[in-house]
Amino acid sequence: MNTKTNFRWVICAMLFMATAVNYLDRQVLSLTWDEFIKPEFHWNESHYGTITSIFSIVYAVCMLFAGKFVDWMGTRKGYLWAIGIWSAGACAHALCGVVTESVVGLHNSTEMIQAVGDTAVLISTVSMYCFLVARSILALGEAGNFPAAIKTTAEYFPKKDRAYATSIFNAGASIGALFAPLTIPLLAKHLGWEMAFVVIGLLGFIWMGIWVFLYDKPEHSKYVSKEELAYIEQDKELDNSSSEDLDTPVEKKLSFRQCLKYRQMWAFVIGKFMTDGVWWFFLFWTPSYLNTQFGIKTTDPMGMALIFTLYAITMLSIYGGKLPTLFINSAMKKGREFDPYAARMKAMLIFAFFPLVVLLAQPLGRISPWFPVILIGIGCAAHQSWSANIFSTVGDMFPKSCIATVTGIGGMAGGLGSMLMQKVAGELFVYSAATDMTFLGFRGMPAGYFIIFCVCATSYLIGWVIMKTLVPKYKVITL
């Protein structure tokens, strides 16, 4: 090829679509459980909290091994395995009702809804375990998405562009969450909640067919010109492993134990642990929050508008990955060196302040539900901007050969933090409603939500301080 190509952005678009499908699959339960699944299986907030927390812990544990698996299998095959498993898991949710009916000895959903006493308890228990199995399969596959995506970004983008590329594909989470309330409740309403899982789950198999024909490593891709390859590898000499084949067994790699001896690893791990649970809480609980506190269902026009607005605001995060590049370019124009880690930490500090607006969600919610939705949307946008940059710190400081492994370890920490958040939230909401507890002028379940919002608002600043303390300056790890 004699002209410069931009195929790296096609790959970025594929990562974007994979992440969008990932979050669509993840959102089906949160948008159907309160209105469709809860009455059929006699669930309460504790059941839902248990399911989301188990999903988080399975996701966390699998993230630890998913990164290592992707490093071993290679980006192309590793991504195919991941999305194939999670798509199968998504479709498997549709079988939970049939299995529950068979175990309990009932014949249809109407009989399950009308059940009372011990039968209702049995239905709730059996169905919960069925969903736990399906959810675990989903978590197993979804755990591979971000390790594979971050590894792909490191292969196709120079360091200065990685946060921006990450913010673009990470925005797929917002797009998936954005389209979810416009499609999933309607599918559930007209086709049944089971078909909502199946239809959304099939999207992953379509993505797999496209990925097979498009992806190859840039140095082997027929779609990447020499000029584009030179751009991709512009900082090659700064990466001690970038001249090595990422998928060959002779390259130097880090074991789990070796990774844990580096402060850079612990900074990433703690940053993920402190903040991932916030995003997952908003993702899993906002539809229920609107229904519980304001009586707004996701199938209502108002509910759709509110959820759409929340994730439309979250889309602003796409600019969050551009901020470090602006800092670096500005410093270079002035003749000063500005390392990528310093640029990312400066950007992350800015983003850490925005979630503080969530502290006002409950007080302003007394005026209109639009206020908490807008404020939560700002918090979600800040999280996604933070997430794009914290993921990119891995590529800045670790060799390419172990990026997926390190990302997986950090993802495990984020999943554990999320598991803790989901379980505590579910139990707190049941407790606050049962005891009519009060907190800063709010009573019952709204008081429980206010407590969780306070935790969400402050987690980022605490996480940033710990990260900066552990790794005050940029230092590349060499093997």
Language-model segments: what does each one mean?
Residues 27, 56-64, 143, 177-178, ...:
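Residue-level signature of mid-helix packing/kink "hotspots" within the transmembrane helices
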Residues 130, 134-174:
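Cytoplasmic helix-loop-helix junction between adjacent transmembrane helices
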Residues 84-124, 349-366:
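C-terminal ends and interior cores of transmembrane alpha-helices
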Residues 10-45, 100, 145, 282-287, ...:
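Extracytoplasmic
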Residues 207-215, 358-364, 449-479:
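Multi-pass alpha-helical transporter architecture, strongest
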Residues 79, 131, 345-348:
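Primarily marks hydrophobic transmembrane alpha-helices of the MFS/SLC 12-helix fold
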Residues 29-31, 257-322, 383-387, 391, ...:
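Extracytoplasmic gate region of multi-pass secondary transporters
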Residues 173-222:
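Helix-loop-helix hairpin linking two adjacent transmembrane segments in secondary transporters
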